[in-house]
Regions:
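Helix-breaking motifs and short loop linkers at transmembrane-helix boundaries and internal kinks
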Residues: 39, 71, 92-97, 158, ...
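Conserved MFS/SLC helix-loop-helix module at the cytosolic interface between two early adjacent transmembrane helices
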Residues: 57-96
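Cytoplasmic helix-loop-helix junction between adjacent transmembrane helices
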Residues: 102-139
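Helix-loop-helix hairpin linking two adjacent transmembrane segments in secondary transporters
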Residues: 133-180
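Symmetry-related core transmembrane helices of the 12-TM Major Facilitator Superfamily/SLC fold
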Residues: 163-180, 371-389
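Transmembrane alpha-helices of Major Facilitator/SLC transporters
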Residues: 251-275, 285, 289
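C-terminal transmembrane helical hairpin of 12-TM major facilitator-type secondary transporters
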Residues: 278-321
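A late C-terminal transmembrane helix in Major Facilitator Superfamily
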Residues: 316, 324-370, 374-375, 385
């Protein structure tokens, strides 16, 4: 079977990237259904959310850089097989135990896929602009469409508890078959020894020395954006139903969709801007958006909350893209799987840990006070990210000026003759 042209393969990988994230968000609108059906507590619901993140982080920490050694396609194939198996568990789930198993398996598969998919996207990108667009837009599009489509199906479709998983299962099966014609973008170099293999699979975050400064400077931006995404996906449904009185699953999903849809649209329009411009727009927009959203919650004004979600979603995309642009530019091709896996370790820790804490705290201090505390935390991370962005820009400007001065100071070569 002839391999696809790299440009076509790029779009197939982009679709897979979005589909993995779509599947990761799809169970969210079903959690209230499971809770009502099986009668488990809010703490158990938090555990269901946490087990997915924990297994995904374990996968990122162990097999995140595996594709740099064995090639991209084998890792993606195994991840898709595991994702299909997790969808089967969701379909047959009749109790919390099976639901936990399904979410845990999905976490393992998603962790194996994310760093590899990002690396493959960059490997195959027709241009840096298009690659940056997909890397920035895929999380927003995947998460937004997963929540929205699942919410509509839960509210209006037959067999609402299983239909979304059956659809995802079929799409993953099709993508697994299509993977056969995707060209390999990373030469299989294997491992020098068993010790090398064991060291690669040992749980750790690995960032090459030459990337470390840029990576660490980008972490606050990653934390700010993904923490806010975790807030929307973990407590967003509760805010919409308890604060604004929206009980329709489809409408609730559409309201949550606004945040991620605006992030996706912003990614399309801002992708060719320099990372400094993205940060200069994204960080203030992110801060303004969360403040407006909080004002909507406190005033119980749904229109104000939606406006805040629009502004915050736009800032989310620009901020995340700025961080990813900086990291991508600093990362050698042979280490993309390793570095991007580390990116998602930081991102998903930020996505999950505050959300889990909020899920525990909300029963003690109430939803509004929890949201106030969460927004304060996000704003603090935005301030830290802005400080790092300004510092890095000043260093870059100083380096360019010093280089120009050194060049000007060089004596002109004497003319011969």
């Amino acid at each position: 079977m002839a391999p696809l042209h790299p440009h076509r393969a790029f779009w197939l990988i982009a679709a897979t990237y979005m589909m993995v994230l779509f599947a990761s968000a799809a169970p969210s609108p079903l959690y209230p259904v499971y809770q009502e059906l099986w009668g488990f507590s809010a703490l158990t619901l938090t555990l269901v959310f946490a087990v997915y993140v924990l297994t995904m982080l374990l996968s990122l920490l162990t097999v995140g850089s595996l594709s740099d050694h064995v090639g991209r396609r084998p890792v993606l194939a195994v991840a898709l097989v595991l994702l299909i198996a997790s969808m089967v568990l969701f379909v047959v789930a009749q109790d919390v135990g099976t639901l936990l198993a399904a979410r845990a398996l999905q976490g393992l598969a998603t962790g194996a896929a994310m760093g590899t998919l990002t690396a493959t996207t960059v490997d195959l990108q027709p241009s840096a602009r298009i690659g940056s667009t997909i890397v920035g837009a895929a999380p927003a599009i995947g998460l937004a469409s997963g929540v929205a489509v699942a919410g509509v199906l839960v509210e209006y479709a037959p067999a609402p508890r299983v239909l979304i998983y059956e659809i995802i299962l079929g799409l993953f099966a099709a993508l697994l078959i299509a993977l056969l014609v995707v060209p390999e973008t990373r030469e299989r170099i294997g491992f020098d020894s068993r010790r090398h293999l064991a060291g690669t699979l040992a749980p750790q975050v690995r960032v090459p020395r030459e990337v470390r400064t840029v990576f660490l400077a980008s972490v606050p931006a990653l934390v700010a954006t993904w923490s806010l995404g975790g807030l929307y996906l973990s407590l967003g449904s509760s805010v919409v139903s308890r604060v604004f009185g929206v009980d329709n699953h489809g409408a609730a999903g559409a309201i949550l969709f606004v945040f991620f849809a605006c992030a996706a649209l912003t990614s399309l329009f801002i992708t060719d801007r320099p990372s400094t411009v993205k940060a200069a727009y994204g960080l203030p927009a992110l801060a303004a958006g969360v403040v407006i959203s909080l004002a909507g919650v406190l005033a119980e004004s749904l229109p104000l909350y939606i406006v805040g979600s629009i502004v915050a979603g736009s800032g989310w995309a620009a901020t995340f893209l700025s961080a990813m642009d900086n990291i991508t530019a600093a990362t050698p091709p042979a280490q993309r799987g390793q570095v991007f896996s580390s990116v998602f370790v930081a991102s998903y820790l930020a996505f999950s840990v505050p959300a889990v804490i909020a899920g525990i705290v909300v029963s003690h201090i109430g939803l509004r006070d929890t949201i106030i505390g969460y927004v304060g935390y996000v704003l603090a991370m935005v301030m830290i990210a802005a400080t790092f962005a300004v510092t890095m820009r000043r260093r870059a400007t100083t380096a360019v000026r010093d280089s120009a001065e050194d060049a000007a100071a060089q004596p002109e070569p004497a003319c011969k003759g």
